[in-house]
Amino acid sequence: MATATNPRLDTQEKAMCRAINAFRAEHGKPPLKLSVALTRSAEWMAKDMARHDNLDHADSKGRDFDERMDDFGYTAPTKGEVIAAGHSDAASTLAQWKASPLHRPILLKSRLKVMGIGRARNVSSDFEWFWTADFGGTVTKTMPI
């Protein structure tokens, strides 16, 4: 599933990377680098959720986030994922995650070192926008934010 070029983040995806790192800094956590493999995984998942109009950590192939990240080349043991739908912008989506008792601890996990971000749009969906952020505890190939 790997390609020769790095994934390209749009303006809001880049804003999300910066916002997650700012949130972590507010809580004394180190910044995360942007992982190529995790970004590919997150982008694929956001598109899969949008395509199927389904907000779920299990993808259309029946994989959980751990299996999917493995398939995209991120095989390190420490992993996490947050997903959201309904907002096009990073600030509103991060606010959803920060308010969630399940997602907030993942964003602030001390052992994390890298992240990957993806968002996708389905104009036919009531949600319209779907977001995925994948996280890992081992630095592999990274790219600039």
Please describe what each predicted stretch is.
Residues 22, 67, 105:
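Surface-exposed charge patches
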Residues 76, 84-145:
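Disulfide-stabilized extracellular recognition modules
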Residues 39-88:
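Short, surface-exposed glycine/acidic/tryptophan-bearing loops
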Residues 35-37, 61-62, 109-111:
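Short, glycine-/polar-rich solvent-exposed loops and beta-turns at beta-strand/coil boundaries
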